Regions:
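Active-site flanking residues adjacent to catalytic metal/cofactor-binding acidic residues
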Residues: 25, 95-97, 124
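Conserved N-terminal beta1-alpha1 strand-loop-helix module at the mouth
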Residues: 1-64, 69-82, 86-93
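Short acidic, glycine/proline-enriched helix-loop-strand junctions
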Residues: 91, 96, 142-143
Length: 191
């Protein structure tokens, strides 16, 4: 379990590895080697370990995407948990989960992700407001959230672009999330 605050861990990894690379760990069944699926009892963990072993000196962070593990059911969740545990302590872990609920539910996410899995940061969908961000920032000082502000998918313009003559939803998300982050000890970034 890492005791370093997220930002310090990230900056150290950037300096040591001379890298700003955050590598996604998103196992897609159709892209896994055929031998991984047919020969291994647990294809995800050996595959992820091989990637981590080959890249640990090249990255500053790993970003597993929760959805790619949930598609494998309980075995995928176990593989994700073991993958997170396998990542070297000096490399930041950003869980791409895009969670966004309120109060007790976000607090439960915080307990699971920050306390049990010890990820350093998590992506958050702020649509429900401050209640999606504050419980996570308050959970463990030094942990971080990345708030979705403007995404790159083609349909994003409809809601994230200019809705009127004003600045649009993305600008409002940035402004609001900056205020939410100022109220706690956590760190808040944007994607």
């Amino acid at each position: 379990m890492s005791q370093l605050p997220y930002l310090e861990k990230l900056r150290r990894a950037q300096a040591v590895n001379n890298s700003w690379l955050c590598l996604g760990l998103d196992p897609q069944p159709e892209l896994l080697p055929v031998e991984a699926i047919h020969k291994w009892d647990e294809p995800l963990l050996p595959f992820n370990r091989a990637i981590i072993d080959a890249t640990a000196d090249l990255v500053c962070a790993y970003k597993p995407n929760l959805g790619f593990y949930l598609q494998w059911g309980a075995a995928g969740v176990i593989a994700l948990e073991r993958t997170i545990a396998y990542i070297p302590d000096d490399i930041a872990i950003i869980l791409d989960a895009k969670i966004g609920d309120i109060g007790h539910t976000q607090a439960a996410w915080g307990r699971g992700l920050f306390d049990e899995w010890d990820v350093d940061a998590v992506t958050v969908n702020p649509y429900v407001g401050a209640e999606a961000v504050r419980p996570l920032l308050a959970r463990r000082p030094g942990k971080a959230v990345y708030v979705l502000a403007r995404t790159s998918n083609p349909g994003a313009q409809r809601f994230q672009g200019d809705l009127t003559a004003g600045a649009g939803l993305a600008a409002e998300v940035l402004r609001s999330a900056g205020q939410w982050a100022g109220a706690g000890d956590g760190h808040c970034g944007f994607v």
